[in-house]
Amino acid sequence: METTTKKARSLYIPYAGPVLLEFPLLNKGSAFSVEERRNFNLSGLLPEVVESIEEQAERAWLQYQGFKTEIDKHIYLRNIQDTNETLFYRLVQNHLEEMMPVIYTPTVGAACERFSEIYRRARGVFISYPNRHNMDDILQNVPNHNIKVIVVTDGERILGLGDQGIGGMGIPIGKLSLYTACGGISPAYTLPVVLDVGTNNQQLLNDPLYMGWRHPRITDDEYYAFVDEFIQAVKQRWPDILLQFEDFAQKNAMPLLTRYRDEICSFNDDIQGTAAVTVGTLIAASRAAGSQLSEQKIVFLGAGSAGCGIAEQIIAQTQREGLSEDAARQNVFMVDRFGLLTDRMPNLLPFQAKLVQKCDNLQHWDTENDVLSLLDVVRNVKPDILIGVSGQTGLFTEEIIREMHKHCPRPIVMPLSNPTSRVEATPQDIIVWTEGNALVATGSPFSPVIWKDKVYPIAQCNNAYIFPGIGLGVIASGASRITDEMLMSASETLAKHSPLVNNGEGLVLPALKDIQVVSRAIAFAVGKMAQQQGVAVKTSAEALQQAIDDNFWKPEYRDYRRTSI
């Protein structure tokens, strides 16, 4: 039986003339048909030729190639996004591998630092502390009524760059761009938000161009009351929203997640998304080596909320593979700037306290140091996996990597800190120091390493493999919460798509060109698990798949028809 592609239904539009051309979600530019130009008062406002979206995308690609710096390319793409969103996503879809590092990490870091300097047009919602009592009115000002995904930041811990104030808005904008480009979530359903609670970045406070609230950051009870007002206003406006916390400081990230994950459908991508993609990568790497994650010893450099979130997800996975909780925790070693986390270390945060090693178990270690450094830990633990989430460059030294390789023939080394300027070690150095034997995955994109005439592909342990699929799965299933089991199902699905596992060679993670396929598969796994967990209404597998297909937006123009307001 011959299949036919179902034609998208026409959209009925009340806007016309220049107003329509200024509406990024609806603007087609030179692709408005002759009939649409006549019906929507556009005749004479556009050049004569009616173009297809592919013709527009080809021109945009040529213009893009004319820019020499990554930040200029970023600014150009953001301008298209703020002019014609459908064209923006078609262009990004056509050149995803080239453009993902430009619209998000690492280039978005520079865009956040220069936000007030390169600002051109409003996008998203800025809620400042002085406006805290007007939140309901502010959210009513959002023109898109059917918002389904919000990414919110307070700008305090932007990548590895620290406090960027309202410049942090670049992160929600970039993140939501990937929800659409990778996960097929319509841009009409997305909303970036920055909570402007001031900044402690003196450079910003002294900058005459800075556009945020010029005030030191509010903290403690005032801060949490402000965030709570925001959460309650969001629940009132969009009760079924998916809320993603993004780049909150360590002292606030885990408390906010703990407080709200059972009150509103929410997750923290820095903690849970990073953990899910890292665990998926490690499952795949372990299987490719003919073993399980539960058989590995793992050392972390960085014991903040992200590092501890990854560690807890690893522990949960190794328990699924058969370890007891105590045995699983004994395989994970957390090192921060004060050394190895132990049960005698004072002033640990609650989420760190669960990840300490008992000093009684360390008495046989070969060291004379009271503070156990990363080198001490690597020398005594003899780990199979080394993960960096420190945000500090160069901490995986040659001595440390060579010491690890001395005891592990095929070490897995994951310097995950963003942006590239903060990476713990470069893939080039790791490959050289391990004589080509390391499997390397990074947080930011790196080119393949060539060493002794052999090419070593470098996997990017990018959260974009995970969060777009989670978002699509939540929307398609109608899930009311995001459970740990849903995140673990996302990790398992990602591992199943590993070329290294499936083909015995290649990258440990799928190619970016296949990311929409991966996102769909993760969406199905997440939606199915949501149903099993009782946080979504149970349906057949066919109905869930159909819901995913129905919610997967494609960057294609639809026919417009005129209607009154």
From Swiss-Prot:
Class of this enzyme: oxidoreductase
Short name of one Pfam family: malic
Gene Ontology molecular-function annotations: malate dehydrogenase (decarboxylating) (NAD+) activity; metal ion binding; NAD binding; oxaloacetate decarboxylase activity
One annotated GO biological process: malate metabolic process
Cofactor requirements of the protein: Mg(2+); Mn(2+)
EC number from the UniProt entry: 1.1.1.38
Thylakoid is among the record's keywords: no
Catalytic activity of the protein: (S)-malate + NAD(+) = pyruvate + CO2 + NADH; oxaloacetate + H(+) = pyruvate + CO2
The record's free-text note on cofactor binding: Divalent metal cations. Prefers magnesium or manganese.
Binding site for a divalent metal cation: 246-247, 270
Site note Important for activity, residues: 270
InterPro entries on file: Aminoacid_DH-like_N_sf (IPR046346), Malic_enzyme_CS (IPR015884), Malic_N_dom (IPR012301), Malic_N_dom_sf (IPR037062), Malic_NAD-bd (IPR012302), Malic_OxRdtase (IPR001891), NAD(P)-bd_dom_sf (IPR036291), NAD_malic_enz_proteobac (IPR023667)
Catalytic machinery residues: 104 (proton donor), 175 (proton acceptor)
Domain of life: Bacteria
Subunit structure: Homotetramer.
PANTHER family per UniProt: MALIC ENZYME-RELATED, NAD-DEPENDENT MALIC ENZYME, MITOCHONDRIAL
HAMAP family tied to this protein: NAD_malic_enz (MF_01619)
Name by which UniProt lists this protein: NAD-dependent malic enzyme
UniProt organism field: Salmonella choleraesuis (strain SC-B67)
